[in-house]
A protein has these predicted regions:
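Short hydrophobic/aromatic-enriched beta-strand-loop microsegments
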Residues: 1, 107-116, 164-170
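Conserved N-terminal subdomain of the carbohydrate kinase-like
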Residues: 1-58
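Short glycine-rich anion-binding loops that position phosphate/pyrophosphate groups of nucleotides
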Residues: 5-7, 35-37, 65-68, 115, ...
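Short, charged, surface-exposed secondary-structure boundary motifs
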Residues: 8, 41-42, 118-124, 173-178
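A polyampholytic, Gly/Pro-enriched intrinsically disordered region
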Residues: 19-34, 107-118, 132
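Conserved beta-alpha-beta core of the PfkB/ribokinase-like small-molecule kinase fold
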Residues: 46, 59-129
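Conserved phosphate-binding/catalytic region of the ribokinase-like
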Residues: 81, 99, 127-191
């Protein structure tokens, strides 16, 4: 429990367009994310002690941005600390936060196709392209790579070398917040 700044407020803004038939559709979605709590060295040490209780077969999910008061290597530091414990670690983060942990062989990483493309400096528009670059992340150390592609579905490149492609379900998106988090949770539940 942190003593100062215990809450973080994130605001999601959606721009609606009204079509000729009067139907409203989301044309753009923007995020304004708060900074999060202040974390002291003492509080960080307590957190590390809690991590030390993890054992073989436990699952740890490292997701999202990190507070600015923590080192930018915090995910990597956590994985290094736990590497001999055989904890199954999932990382859902962007560019450097994600790439920097690959040497510690995360069980699952979950970028979206835009984040995956950003890592390699390319635009990925087909599932075949996504599979190619997901395999590159495996070569860099990830065991399983699950890539969400919004309305175009998803791709999984599994640690046994199999690849799976899925279409997105039909429907009208009301809000995409948490979609990637729920995908990672669904994968873990089904695993």
């Amino acid at each position: 429990q942190v003593k100062k700044g215990i809450s973080r407020i994130n605001v999601k803004l959606r721009s609606l367009q009204v079509g000729e038939n009067g139907e409203k559709t989301v044309s753009e979605e923007s995020e304004i994310n708060g900074m999060g709590p202040e974390i002291s060295g003492e509080e960080l040490e307590i957190f590390y002690q809690q991590l030390d209780a993890l054992q073989k077969g436990d699952i740890l999910v490292l997701a999202g941005s990190i507070p600015t008061v923590l080192p930018s290597t915090i995910y990597r530091d956590i994985m290094k600390r736990l590497q001999k414990r055989e904890v199954m670690i999932v990382v859902d983060a962007t560019k450097n936060l994600l790439v920097n942990v690959l040497e510690y062989h995360p069980f699952l990483i979950k970028p979206n196709n835009y984040e995956l493309g950003e890592i390699f400096g390319v635009t990925l528009s087909t599932k075949e392209d996504v599979i190619l670059y997901a395999k590159k992340l495996q070569e860099m150390g990830a065991a399983n790579v699950l890539v969400s592609m919004a309305g175009d579905g998803a791709v999984l490149v599994a640690e046994d070398g199999s690849t799976y492609k899925s279409e997105a379900p039909e429907g009208k998106v009301k809000n995409s917040v948490g979609a990637g988090d729920s995908m990672a949770a669904g994968f873990l539940y089904g695993y």
